[in-house]
Amino acid sequence: MRRKISNNPDDYIEPLYMNGLHGRMLRIPGPPRKKREILLVYGHHSSLERLFGLAQDISRYGTVTMPDLPGFGGMEPFYKLGEKPSLDNLADYLAAFVKLKYKRRRVTIMGMSMGFLVATRMLQRYPELAKKVDILVSVVGFVHRDDFKFKKRNYLLMRYGSSFFSNFLPAWIAKTFVLRAPLIRLTYRSVADRHSKMRDADKNELKRRIDFEIVLWKCNDIRTYMDTTVSMLTADLCKERVDLPVYHIAVPGDRYFDNKIVEQHLNVIYSKAEVIVSKVSAHAPTIIATAEDIEPFVPPKIRRMLAKA
């Protein structure tokens, strides 16, 4: 019988102060006899609440810890320190968290999309941390700009549009006049029938998803969002090796990534890359997915690995 876990993420969230920045951290204790420590790193346009369902689900295998990333989930951005949210800075931040939180303990790392990109860069910059990792899981992650399968026109529009809005004045204008709840709601409603996050939702579910999208757009720093978009679209981590095997959860028909190319790049970086296809076809679970909704997303093989002592 599965133990009872609160469905309120606030019951597991605590303050976090790292590298001069205030944020939050989610920690769900595992079952008494499970000693595994799992570090969950969320991706782009995310928060602790967005991945709470996944954290709930995998906490059956051990204690799950998920920190905010600077500029995401309401955490103060690197700009407060006069720094940019570069991939290296994010990797350094994550390394500091791992060293502080886990010290000499072993850790399982699961990185979601951009979160896996950050985790990979951390392991490249801090190879000593790779020795602490017992299992490394990429959850629809990527490591190179060519992993994306956007059309060239769309790629260039996102690449240079994001670069423009990562500057202070354009970002301020967007935050002040564009990212307003009524306008966000109107935009999502107008494209709901063809938007991948919305089209399968009924009226009540659609409202819940849009309301949560509004929260995400409000709690994520717009400059950080845009600057990290540029980092993702220009990434190339294939120049340094990591002495670890990686298990990559892929989804069939991923609308963002070419799974074959992702696998090739993972094999360039890691000692071994094994692709395990999820039963779920979406790039990520819905933004309000519960632990029960998440369950089909994590393949049985990954579950068996996590279940081992």
Predicted regions and their residues:
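Alpha/beta-hydrolase fold catalytic core
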Residues: 1-38, 59-62, 102, 289, ...
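Conserved loop-alpha-helix segment in the C-terminal half of the alpha/beta-hydrolase fold
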Residues: 56-57, 245-281
